[in-house]
Amino acid sequence: MTGKPAGLVLLTAISAFAAVSGVVYDFTPTHIFNPAWPPHAQFHGYLSIARTVLIMLAVIVLAWGPVRAGLPYAWGVLVLLLLGWLAIWFVAPVVVSGTGDLPAYLFAAVLTAPALVGIWLVRPRRTGA
């Protein structure tokens, strides 16, 4: 498998992994169900995971629909959603001190390289001269 099909599969795998791992990791007694967390913090934890799942679902739908069909606007939206979501992992510790930790940076760093490769593989290409 080469080119666009490989990129579609790669973006699907990354998106599915990000969505599922967020639910598995955050819906635990150490995070959203942590009794030490105030209810408002638990609510924001839930919102963060819900947004991640929806963004990753949108990436998959865009990839296999309009991006696969070669529509440039869809590729731009896909790039904005996926790279924007990844950027949040690196920007959050700067904006909210004390929120950065090595596992979060590693999670984002590990997903960034294959995301860039997938985005490049599904990029719109000019046809003809």
Spans of features found by a protein language model:
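Membrane-water interface at the C-terminal end of transmembrane alpha helices
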Residues: 112-129
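Core segments of alpha-helical transmembrane spans in multipass integral membrane proteins
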Residues: 21-23, 40-64, 80-83
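Alpha-helical transmembrane segments of multi-pass membrane proteins
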Residues: 16-29
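Membrane-helix boundary connector in multi-pass membrane proteins
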Residues: 68, 89-105, 124-125
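Hydrophobic alpha-helical membrane segments
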Residues: 52-58, 75-93, 112-114
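Cytosolic juxtamembrane helix and N-cap/initiation of the first transmembrane helix
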Residues: 1-18
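Short juxtamembrane and helix-loop transition motifs at transmembrane-helix boundaries
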Residues: 34-43, 65-73
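Non-cytosolic membrane-interface motifs at loop->transmembrane helix junctions
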Residues: 35-42, 98-110
